[in-house]
Every structure is written in C-alpha cells, then in structure tokens.
Amino acid sequence: MKNTQRHKYKDKEICETRTLTFDPYPYSEIDQVIRLIQDNLTSDLLKGRKSLMYPSDVLTNKYYGHCYHSSQALHYLMDCDILTPMSGEDYRGEKHWWLQDGQKIYDCTAKQYLDRGEHPPYNTGKKTNWYGWKQRPQQISLTLMKRVLDDRLISDIVTKP
C-alpha cells in the first residue's frame, strides 16, 4: 500500500490534505502503466493551464501539454524509488518532462515529438525538482492517477486539521 499526499496551505500552515491510498504498480509493469496513462490523457486535464506555448497544438496532438502531470503520475504510481524527474528544452524552446532510471528513459508523451518527425530533448535533459512549493503533487496528477489506478485505488480522502 502507498500514500500520495497533497497539502493545501494557508499562511504557511496546512489547512487541507488530500490523500490517495493505493496499491502501487511493480516496476516490472512500468511499460503497461505508461500505456494506461496515455489511454487516460484527455483535454479536460489541461483546462485552466495558462502555460501552454502552443495551445492550438492540443487540437491535433493528444500528448501535447501532458508531459509534466504524466511524468509526475508515473513517478508516484510505481513501487520504486529509482525514477528521477528530468526536463529539457525542446526544439521550440518549451520545457519537456520525463523520468529516467540511469540511462533508461520513460516518457509518456514522447509521441508528441515522434509524430512530427522530431526528437524529444533528452540530450538537453537534467535532473529537475517537481514544480510548486515543497514539490507537492499537482491536483491534475492526482486526477490522472485515479483514472489509471481504477480498482487499485483504495481511497481518495480530503481531511482538514
């Protein structure tokens, strides 16, 4: 069993905690989990995002805009601690995210490049901390995790101190 928590803060104090409790996937199933993540990427996960450099790409490229929360979801869904968040600047000057285990790359959204005849920016990649205060998981990542977990999800609970 594994817990992933996201705290909400007010005046630097925790005022709410969302906790997903679930049965994580074994590392040996990482390719299957990547496919599950890909199958669950939908445009509603991008609602409210202001940081997309090319918003019209969402209409023609299923994977565009999903690299961060896909990578973060994969990181938390796996039953291991050897996946490193990585990012690099792509051919259009946009940041792209993926995970690595040594030299092995796990990229849920690489097809956004490959389908255009381009290469993901692995050659410019570096270890990168998750965004946000205290590197907490994004709500979008938790929503994607719930979709992927299906019957592996034990609970999704919001508590207040």
Please describe what each predicted stretch is:
Residues 2-161:
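A structural boundary/capping signal
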